[in-house]
Amino acid sequence: MPAVLPIKLNPSQMRPVAYRIFSKKHGLNLKSTGLETLTEIIGKNYGTEWRGAEAAKMMEEICRLWKEQEMGVFVEGKPLQELFDEITASKKAKEKARVQVVSKSVGLTGVEEIEDREGEPQVNVIREAAPSVDVVWKEFFKVISAFDQPLFHYNARQQRFEKRKTKPTLFANAQSASNMFLTRYHLVYNRLLRNDDTTDLKITSIRSLIGRQGEFSIFGMLSKNPEQKICLQDDTGRILLILAAGCKPDPGVYYPEGSFVICNGRYMKSGDAEVFVVITMGPPVAEKRQETITAYGNMDYLGLHGNPHGSVVRRIERQVEASMLAEEKRLVDQKVIVFGGDMYLDNPLTLKALQKVFSTIELEFQDSGTKKPLAMVFSGDFTSQYQPPHLYKKGFDKLEELFKEFSSIITGVKIIFVPGQRDPWTNTFPTQNAVVPLQPLPTTMINRVARLCGEDVSMSSNPCRMAYLTQDMVFYRDGLSERLRKCNLQLDSAKDDSDDSDDDIEIDNDEVMINDVVVNEPESSFDFGEGLSNLTRPVDISTPMASQVGPTNTLSAKEVESRKIVRTICDQGHLSPFNRHDRPVAWDYDETLWLSPLPTILFMVDTHAPKFSLRYEECMVVNPGPFLNRKIASWVEYDPSKKTVKERQLHI
């Protein structure tokens, strides 16, 4: 293609051509900044042929993508430039695309010699295969901190994501707090409407209940009123909840304040009190990852396919996604090593255990010729007690010496540190209520490790994500099990509430019977000595308990507890389904805690929960437990090509 000599155009020259294509044909309105940017693009890339067919074709492509990505009616300069850069990058990728045609004829590729039946001369028939894009997996392998993750605004009315117009901050205003819970509500509500199993379910808003009779289904967030009575709250109002006789909320999940539930029952009014008598209650069902991605137009949630902080919502091309999936299956020797939590570097036994673990991995690497792992994930707390900075730093200095000793398996491997509650500077919150997401470890604390590993070390936030081709891996270090048990609401009847209050609620027992219903808490301590019996083959819990094969009462307390945790987190679509008092969240960064879409795998490192590996709605959730317990070091290895997890243990 001959080189193009750029020219300088004036917006007044470009306006008639742009109006004909953008406004008259596609109904778009070019703002002054958009016209200036378009003039510069066309003049620079098409020169004297700015009125030609190629320039018009480019403008048509811009209009098509602008409307396809639902970027609005008004075309402004910055998003227009980003969209043009995206088109240019896509064209370059397609030019590099390899066309592979394999013929059944021996020695022929893409060409078959065919002889006519009537003896006519042979002809060459060229069969073109669909091009596949060359994918270099390292370009789609990235560790994403919560504070670097692209953030979006959810437009509930149009049910689509848009780029945020304001920069997030840790010191957000009160409007961000209200928007945080409203966005959670709309995301789960729209997911509920998409579910095929709930297509016949008609959700009534709380405001619409007033003055109506009969049974209704309402959806909202569990909360408490000033009298500390349990209520349900949606975007229209709040109503007091009372459980009717025979009502047994789904026992397979927790019900913390701040979680979302569906209630079926009757609206009643006695004096000034308005109540909703609940007949059935349960959580919204989780949605498979691919279904969520398809519902929102194959969005690039993690910013792998362009500028993650640009003003354009990028979509992943199906052709690129298919090539990434093929590359993912081809790379069979890749693995991610995730160590258990509470890696106390101030404990000599921990360093001894790490030395033995590294020695085992190095021996396997040298003897069997296996590849180095993609990444090693170390989860806090990295100290057993609160320590001053200079003592805390000593632990990482000793870790750096270990890395030097085993440089053959450390060099070129992504090293990820996920902070815990006692790590700086989170340890300024001794009440176990630090604001999430937790910020990364200070660079000054691990400067020797950073110098040794260079760009391969990642001081990540908690939680953080790892993107690997089509997969999304989430790493979260928290005591979720303890917090869920502590914050689980006791769903008592109106009779118990009225004992402590003077304003009794009168209910006709002939119409609705009331009794005590309490969600019992499971045991709070577990023995980790037995290890994970089901880690290599994760148990699929997508099927409800009642329909699973075999008696459900044969499940151990550990299995019941682990299933409740997984279902609660996945059904809520959030890593912290609590109110702002039980678990404070940085309001502008709440999106980094979403599990919508569900990740490919969630490493939920909880040292107070039983070890488990469960699969729920095609999302694998793994808890490796503590790193060191009873002189046994534990870690897990994840194979992305097979999507399997293998438990490893080593006696110290």
From Swiss-Prot:
GO cellular component term, pick one: epsilon DNA polymerase complex
GO MF: DNA polymerase processivity factor activity; DNA-directed DNA polymerase activity; double-stranded DNA binding; single-stranded DNA binding
Compartments where found: Nucleus
The keyword DNA-binding is annotated on this UniProt entry: yes
Chief location: nucleus
One Pfam family, short name: DNA_pol_E_B
InterPro entries given in the database record: DNA_pol_a/d/e_bsu, POLE2
Coiled-coil residues: none
Family label: Belongs to the DNA polymerase epsilon subunit B family.
Further details from the record: In eukaryotes there are five DNA polymerases: alpha, beta, gamma, delta, and epsilon which are responsible for different reactions of DNA synthesis.
Subunit-level organization: Heterotetramer. Consists of four subunits: POL2, DPB2, DPB3 and DPB4.
Job of this protein: As accessory component of the DNA polymerase epsilon (DNA polymerase II) participates in chromosomal DNA replication.
Protein name per Swiss-Prot or TrEMBL: DNA polymerase epsilon subunit B
Provenance organism: Yarrowia lipolytica (strain CLIB 122 / E 150) (Yeast)
Lineage: Eukaryota, Fungi, Dikarya, Ascomycota, Saccharomycotina
Gene: DPB2
